[in-house]
From Swiss-Prot:
It comes from Dictyostelium discoideum (Social amoeba). It holds the Pfam family FHA. Residues 366-389, 662-672 have a biased composition (Polar residues). This is Bromodomain-containing protein DDB_G0278469. PROSITE patterns: BROMODOMAIN_2. Keywords: Bromodomain, Coiled coil. The keyword Coiled coil applies. Residues 20-45, 186-204, 215-227, 234-254, 261-281, 405-414 have a biased composition (Low complexity). The keyword Coiled coil applies. Gene3D superfamilies: 2.60.200.20, Bromodomain-like. Residues 322-368, 437-470 form a coiled coil. Residues 332-359, 684-715 have a biased composition (Acidic residues).
């Protein structure tokens, strides 16, 4: 007994131990799960925080525009994203967004503003434009206080230029947007066009089913148990309403079938009244027995006087015309080839019907009765298989009822076919134009640059490149007239390349101002223009300087010298390596300042500074260039003016080795130690003295002759 009790106690203890172990395991599992949750939650919090940070970053990364900063050679140096509504440009490091450290640039020079309400970009100068004219939009000086910017406009401040590219939605007038950025309106139109293309075939199928249903109702007549062919010959003219005159021996089910057919025909008559009036040339005969005294329009009466076959044909024509109108609109948007095949099938059905009608007309002329089976088979062809083949009444073929005259459809079908072929050809052309090879993004950017350059340079030409007349400077002050004379003096000096000609007298020389007279535009290729005007942000020419001098009251000698210097700088900017154009530009500088010194507009010190700098460069170029140009000074020959025509000129070659020879040969021109053009005072004085002596001798001879004549008169 004791053994049994001890065994039971041991079993109870084992059970309790197992329960405790299970409880401990469960608790441990829960703790592990909690620990796992605690380990997972920080990661989740971290990811959620990262997501929030990303969202904030995305909000901060909203870009309104991009500014492409250019180097002097036209390449892109840096791209700056405009993430604010205002972008300040100047020389202050703290307050400006684009830093420009150039002379003439103020701390806050200008700002670019994006107006959110109007959705436009503006350039607002923070300095009065009359004080500082260094701001230029597409090479044109900035005049207004605030001006609207266009996409891909080039803004230059001092010698720094950059191009603005829009990213925010902008309302721009008469400007071309890039093809990869399409407005929302164009996207909506494309979606609507796609929906219409999808809905068009389904709508046409529904129309076709409705018309076929109407045709089946029109051709099926109520079957009678007692019908005699003799009565059919003397029956009144067949109309849609004449079915009421036929004796009714059918059941009520057939009467129910007649009513929807009449309603359907009435609706079809109302729909097709416009088409029947165009095809019918003479009115059909009216029925004597009117139904319930209703007064109907002429178009509905014409439909009643026609055969069921003719009604069917008119309905088919209207269907084809409506389909052609729809397909013409869809072809412009790119119609499918399946619809064109359906139209061809319908046209073939029309031709078959016309052939059957021609056979019937021939049989009528020969007075041969038409069999009912043929008429039934002719009616069954265009209809569905479920329709009943019942012969129509033959009263329309009698002599008493005149046949309705109508325009033959052969001409109509030919014209429609021609129209279809024309439209198909047009569509093929448009498809071929759309399926041309796609332009790369670089070509698109080049086209946009060319268009902006053309537009802006044409404005510059229309404003500053007008023809100059001497009469325009008569009313101006003496200082401006002297400046014009100095600019004209450059053309009197010409150049040629050494070794090109053997005889100096037969030299075909080129004026120094040939390449500076106008800015390059008309006689140059687009690739050259794109390269030139992407490097040269401030184009200047002698003609533009003269136009500004003529029209601008504040445009004086200081502004002329500044633009003239910029014109010569443009040569070195475009031609990076030394060449003959550098040589020509330095010679122009010497000749221009020489003429200004002679007119008294500048001092000797100013001239010497310019001469020394240009002459040093010319000496270097003479050593490095393969073909060294040679100056040719052109002067008016005063001694030969009486014998030769006006404007006769003499060409004199200038060279450092020939100075002594020219002096010994009594040449009217000599050159000092600096190589400048100087006239001989001794020769001029000797000429003047000889002229005075000859005048005095002639006066004495005249006095002697007059005294002798007086003495003879007194004697």
């Amino acid at each position: 007994m004791e053994d049994i009790s001890t065994i039971k106690k041991l079993e109870g203890l084992s059970v309790h131990c197992e329960d405790n172990n299970n409880n401990n395991n469960n608790n441990n599992n829960k703790e592990n799960i909690n620990n796992d949750d605690n380990n997972i939650n920080p990661n989740r919090n971290a990811t959620s925080s990262l997501l929030k940070g990303n969202i904030q970053q995305v909000k901060k990364k909203k870009v309104f525009a991009r500014l492409h900063l250019f180097n002097r050679d036209g390449t892109v140096k840096q791209i700056v994203e405009m993430r604010k509504y205002k972008f300040i440009i100047g020389s202050d490091q703290k307050s400006t967004d684009i830093l420009i450290t150039r002379p003439g640039v103020y701390s806050n020079h200008a700002e670019i503003i994006y107006d959110k309400e109007v959705r436009k970009f503006y350039l607002n100068p923070l300095v009065d434009p009359s004080i500082s004219d260094t701001i230029r939009i597409n090479f044109i000086p900035f005049i207004n206080k605030k001006e609207v910017l266009g996409n891909n406009d080039i803004i230059s401040i001092g010698l720094r230029a950059f191009r603005i590219e829009f990213f925010a939605p902008v309302y721009v007038d008469n400007l071309i947007l890039p093809k990869n950025i399409q407005p929302q309106q164009q996207q909506q139109k494309q979606q609507q066009q796609q929906q219409q293309q999808q809905q068009a075939p389904t709508a046409q199928k529904k129309l076709k089913q409705e018309v076929e249903h109407i045709l089946t109702a029109a051709t099926t007549t109520p079957t009678t148990t007692t019908t005699k062919p003799k009565k059919l010959k003397t029956a009144p003219p067949t109309t849609v309403a004449s079915s009421s005159t036929i004796p009714k021996t059918t059941t009520t089910k057939k009467q129910a079938i007649e009513q929807p057919s009449k309603s359907n025909l009435k609706s079809s008559q109302n729909k097709l009244s416009t088409t029947t009036t165009t095809t019918i040339t003479s009115k059909p005969p009216l029925n004597k027995s009117s139904i319930d005294g209703d007064t109907r329009s002429e178009s509905s009466k014409a439909l009643q006087g026609l055969k069921p076959k003719e009604q069917k044909k008119d309905i088919m024509k209207s269907l084809i015309s409506s389909k052609k109108a729809n397909t013409h609109e869809e072809k412009e948007e790119g119609e499918s080839e399946e619809e064109e095949e359906e139209e061809e099938e319908e046209e073939e059905e029309e031709e078959e019907e016309e052939e059957e009608e021609q056979l019937e007309d021939k049989q009528k002329q020969t007075k041969t009765p038409i069999s009912q089976n043929k008429s039934a088979s002719s009616n069954i062809k265009p209809l569905s298989k479920t329709s009943k083949s019942n012969p129509p009444p033959l009263s329309a073929a009698t002599k008493s009822n005149p046949v309705v005259k109508k325009i033959t459809s052969t001409t109509v079908t030919r014209t429609t076919k021609k129209a279809d072929t024309e439209t198909k050809q047009e569509i093929k052309i448009t498809k071929s134009s759309t399926t041309t090879k796609q332009q790369t993004q670089e070509e698109i950017e080049q086209e946009l640059k060319l268009e902006s350059i053309r537009k802006r340079i044409e404005q510059f030409i229309n404003k500053f490149e007008k023809e100059i007349n001497d009469n325009d400077f008569k009313d101006l002050d003496e200082g401006k007239r002297k400046i014009k004379e100095s600019l004209d003096f450059i053309s009197k000096t010409k150049y040629e390349f050494q070794g090109t000609t053997s005889n100096p007298g037969d030299v075909e020389s080129t004026p120094l101002d040939k390449w500076f007279k106008n800015i390059p535009y008309e006689d140059f290729v687009d690739s050259f223009k794109l390269k030139y005007y992407s490097i040269i942000t401030e184009p200047v020419s002698i003609t533009s300087i003269l136009n500004k001098l003529k029209s601008g009251p504040n445009y004086q000698l200081a502004e002329v010298l500044k633009d003239f210097k910029q014109m010569l700088i443009n040569v070195t900017l475009y031609h990076k390596e030394p060449n003959e154009y550098w040589w020509i530009s330095h010679q122009c500088n010497i000749q221009f300042y020489k003429s200004l010194l002679e007119t008294g507009l500048i001092t000797q010190d100013q001239y010497q500074i310019q001469y020394q700098t240009s002459n040093n460069e010319i000496v270097k170029l003479d050593k490095t260039l393969n073909l060294v140009p040679k100056l040719v000074v052109v002067e008016n020959n005063d001694e030969d003016d009486n014998n030769d025509d006006e404007g006769s000129k003499k060409a004199v070659l200038v060279d450092e080795d020939e100075d002594e020879c020219l002096n010994n040969q009594n040449n009217p021109t000599t050159y000092d130690s600096d190589g400048d053009f100087v006239t001989k005072q001794s020769d001029q004085e000797s000429d003047e003295e000889s002229d005075e002596e000859s005048d005095e001798e002639s006066d004495e001879e005249r006095d002697q002759l007059s005294e002798e004549e007086d003495q003879e008169a007194t004697n």
